[in-house]
UniProtKB/Swiss-Prot annotation:
This is Translation initiation factor IF-3. Keywords: Cytoplasm, Initiation factor, Protein biosynthesis. It comes from Azotobacter vinelandii. IF-3 binds to the 30S ribosomal subunit and shifts the equilibrium between 70S ribosomes and their 50S and 30S subunits in favor of the free subunits, thus enhancing the availability of 30S subunits on which protein synthesis initiation begins. Monomer. One of its GO terms (molecular function) is translation initiation factor activity. The lineage of its organism: Bacteria, Pseudomonadati, Pseudomonadota, Gammaproteobacteria, Pseudomonadales.
Length: 181
């Protein structure tokens, strides 16, 4: 059962080619993209065979269906290359996290701020979390002040996507990078 499912997942809908085209008449497009016109399927197959290429159904929804004379293997290869190139150029946005404490000293604050700036410049989102321990929960306003300071310091690099909210003993805020022009 699993093996069958695995094969189904790989199977991609392929365009009907040559004898697999069921229409009687087709609108034929030549090798160089020129319109040949509406011809019978037998005539279209003969023209494709003379050119030693395949007859590929491009648009099955049209009446009559649109078919093109091309090298189908080369067409699949080009399509695969385009998909790979598009995938390669796509950047996966990650969420990077920096953790603060209510008593974070100035030196540590500057280091963490520098890292946040780097994350935002790289195009990643930044999650700023502030953890309270023990009796620090009584002074949540200190945490809010710290997150406001982070927000102000990062104003030129990013915008707040999720404003500070308390979840258990943690205050969290998400900052997204500004769109580049």
């Amino acid at each position: 059962m699993k093996r069958e499912m695995r094969q189904d997942r790989k199977a991609q809908p392929k365009a009907p080619i040559n004898e697999n085209i069921s229409a009687r008449e087709v609108r034929l497009i030549g090798v160089d993209g020129e319109q040949i016109g509406i011809v019978s399927i037998d005539e279209a197959l003969r023209v494709a065979e003379e050119a030693k290429l395949d007859l590929v159904e491009i648009s099955a929804d049209a009446v009559p269906p649109v078919c093109r004379i091309m090298d189908y293997g080369k067409h699949l290869f080009e399509k695969k290359k385009q998909v790979a190139a598009a995938k390669k150029n796509q950047k996966q946005v990650q969420i990077k996290e920096i953790k603060f404490r209510p008593g974070t000293e100035e030196g540590d604050y500057q280091v963490k701020l520098r890292n946040l700036v780097r994350f935002l410049n790289d195009g990643d989102k930044a999650k700023v979390s502030l953890r309270f321990r023990g009796r620090e929960m009584a002074h949540q306003e200190l945490g809010m002040e710290l997150l406001k300071r982070v927000e102000n310091d990062l104003a030129e690099f990013g915008t707040v996507e999720q404003y500070p909210k308390l979840e258990g003993r943690q205050l969290m805020m998400v900052i997204a990078p500004k769109k580049r022009k």
